Structures are given as C-alpha cells and as structure tokens.
Amino acid sequence: MITGQTLRDAILSGANNIANQRVRVDELNVFPVPDGDTGTNMSMTIGAARGELEALPDTCTVAEASKTAASAMLRGARGNSGVITSLLFRGFSKALKGKDEASAEDLANALKMGVEAAYKAVMKPTEGTILTVSRLAAEKAAECTEMEIPAMWDATLAAGQAALEDTPNLLPVLKKAGVVDAGGQGIMII
C-alpha cells in the first residue's frame, strides 16, 4: 500500500526532477508550437503545489495528498503541457477520493482516470504526445495490479519510456526534428 506521506513525497520528488531537467525538456519542444517552454511550464505547474504539499502532515491520506496537488496544479497550470499535467493529476485525485492508502489496483485506476480526464479536455487529442505516453503507461499499470507496487511501477515506467521513444514514429514533426515529445519526456521525468 502507498501512504499519503509516500504519495506526497513522490509528487515533491517529481517536482524536483522536472525543475532540474526543465531546460532539457524545453529543448525538445517542437509540438504543438516550437516555443521552447514545455519543461518550464510543467515545472511551474507541479511546482505550484510544492508549498501546499510540504505543509501536509506526514499523517496525510492519499486522498488529501492527491487533492492538494491537483487543486494547486490546476490553479497554477501554465501552457498546454501544464494544463494537461494538471488534468492528469486531477483525474488521479478523483480516483483516490476518500482513500487513506492506495493499493496497486487503486494506483492503476487513478492513472487511468487521469488519462481519461486529460483526453476529454483536449479538443483534438494527438497521438505521439504526453497523452500517448500517459495512456500506454496507465494501460501497463492496469495489467500489473497483481504485482507488488514497486514492480508494478517499474513496469509502468518501462511502458511509458517505450511509448516516449516511439513518439517520433507517431508524430512526423518529432521525427523530422529528431526528438521525442517534450511533454511525454516531462511526464516521464515527473
């Protein structure tokens, strides 16, 4: 089971990871607009939750940690990638509502609901982006709910990484530029 403290700390770790690698992600940014700000926007979005998450007690529930993060990210979302990131967390949070701890099945369902929220909110979902990476990772998580959570998470991350590496085959602008999707890379870093 994952506790609220573990989830809180994992989200904070993700915020640190993207903050430290935002320039690298910015450099990948060629879709939908090559404005070089995907890493910055994702970092600012998840970073908007930092203070509120740090204020949560170690006894917080997964429901409290996820709702706190999702609410702050929604308020602080920047750019397309930031909005999609906040929606992934919003759906994730809704799936954990009322839960003290999360099982592997709970986490897989939360990832699925996050992906559904993001796809529903995007007018024209494009494959080969953060959406694809998130969806394929969530699908793998759903296949692995009988595993211990660390093993499930490793399999989920491996599926997300494989999906990320395939993004140039799905989106010609990425292949032409010789890069993977910036938003997909950002979500894998988080």
Where does each model-flagged region fall?
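N-terminal loops that bind phosphate or other acidic moieties
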Residues: 1-190
